[in-house]
Amino acid sequence: MPETERVKTLRLDVQDWPGHLPGQHVDIRLTSEDGYQAQRSYSIASPPGSALELTVELVDDGEVSPYLTEEIRIGDRFELRGPVGGYFVWEPSRGGPLLLVAGGSGVVPFRAMLLQLAAAGDPVQATVLHSSRGWDDVIYRDELSALANDHIKVLHTLTRSQPEGWDGYARRVDKEMLAEIGPGPDAQPQIYVCGPTPFVEAVATALVDLGHEPATVRTERFGPTGG
């Protein structure tokens, strides 16, 4: 299912899948006819109790993402390991408030968290700040809008281009923006930051500068190349 021009969501049928938690990921390995192997990690996009979904962004000159976004066909088989990870996991039992800050496809694990939060009907307050280049680049744009309610606040910042009449943020995430959207340190939020390495490092530093304890800021990052 296409999310943007360069991003697709895949639903996978995995034999003996043990189930997963929001914030975990899987490793996918492809093997060519000559034996060459390439492996990449992808965040799980679906909530627990549902079919495994991955949202993949096409990376130019990538070794795995072109196959997953452009070549894969129903019935294809490949190696998958997972679910992997526990550090970046969030479950409703952990409470809130939640602050989720995403850069580009870093929003993928947050979809799983928000869908679980919405399904649980838990009144945990969640604030989502999603940074994208332009409005057409916003992954899960309609779905995030549909999830927004009294308990889930969704905000966007568009760093390169904005549609006519745009009245939201139009710059990179900075300390002032994070202070405006809250929650602040006094609320002791659980904070998750995901995106490209420079984005994650800048946001994490800004959050600590605002007074958030470093131990409360969980980060997951990916490099500018690969795929």
Residue ranges of each PLM-predicted region?
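Reductase modules of NAD(P)H-dependent flavoproteins
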Residues: 124-227
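Conserved S-adenosyl-L-methionine
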Residues: 116-126
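Ferredoxin-reductase
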Residues: 1-76, 132-134, 157-161
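Ligand-binding loop in jelly-roll beta-barrel domains
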Residues: 46-52, 92-95, 122
